[in-house]
Amino acid sequence: MHILEIPSFFTPYGGEFCLEQAKALKALGHEVRILSHVQLGITIGLKDFFLLPYRRYEHQREGITICQSFQRGVPRMIHHNMRRWVSVVESMFCDYVNRYGTPDIIHAHCAKWAGYAAMKISQTYHIPYVITEHLPKMMLSVEFGDCPEKTWQVPLLKSAYEAADMVVPVSEELVEDVSCYFGTHYRWQFISNTIDTDFFHYQPRSSCEGRRFRFCCVADNSYRKGYDVLIPAFRMLKEQGCDAELRIAGRKTDTTGFRSHLSKGITSLGQLRQEQVRDLLYQSDALVLASRSEVQPLVLLEAMSTGIPVISTSCIPQNLRIEGGCTIVPIDDVEGFSAAMKQVMEKPFNDGLRISEQVKAMASPQAVGKKLESLFRSLLS
């Protein structure tokens, strides 16, 4: 099959799940490329806004050809920016067809706005399209608010959902989570995101006996990630005399303001490269994530894939709650989170290999690639 991936956002603003799925499909013998048009924000990254290329170009990344373009967003002009973004994606698709031919299927990541662009392309070229949805209500509500009937965006995105040949939420809970915006009158099938289980392979840990227990957290500094719960929970743990340390990594976790809230035993590492994240996991005994809203946090899968248990909150989807490897605490429960950390410290953990194998069966590139392949073939038959 000839598959074109279109992400709603991509490097330098994340979106690596698109690349991972493209690699998984290419490994199965398919022709796969990525069409990436990224809107840059002057308030998000001044350097990127001015220095990234102003022209369209192609480049290779981990064996995948990426047709790349950047758009400078105009502050407070959401409607203008969206129309321009979709128009450029349509133009890039035309260029793509002239060079590589018409793809058999379009795989858009997130309805806002790759899914909407895919719908418009599908109407012109009569190509089936699939939307994999990654965004939870908490992230969408920042722009849409709690009154979807008053926003111009929601009807457009809802139409993209309803016209899609299939919507693929990365967790089953996501369907209900975003139903206030998109309803449920569309075809959907759950397929997990993928992680590189060979890269995040299982590795035995040394015994915790006679040394400090090592927690880690890999998450950007944002309200959604719950650092205002995790930090006091860890402080409470230390006040009980527990010998533990917590190392934090993620964007904006190395700012002066963030570090001023850290207590004894907590180290902030800032944003890390993928190899550094893996090293941090291998040096840790458990990962903690006190999130308020998640769809499918890949760092939990990555941690369990390396063989360590995780502690998170009730916003985590059921498919991540691997028995013996994932402890769940209510959202915003400082005392409960601290108690869970203490329990993990005191309970010997010997299930690392079993949990790693379960993650591989659900989220390895081969497992996810085969599920996507089967879905795409069924839509084309």
Model region roles, listed by residue range:
Residues 309-312:
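Short hydrophobic beta-strand element within catalytic cores of glycosyltransferases
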Residues 256-275:
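Nucleotide-activated donor-binding/catalytic signature segment of Leloir-type glycosyltransferases, i.e.
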Residues 173, 194:
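Carbohydrate-associated surface elements
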Residues 1-60, 238:
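N-terminal subdomain of nucleotide-sugar transferases
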Residues 326-334, 342-349:
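Conserved acidic donor-binding segment of nucleotide-sugar-dependent glycosyltransferases
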Residues 4, 168, 207-225, 231-235:
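Conserved donor-binding/catalytic core segment of Leloir-type glycosyltransferases
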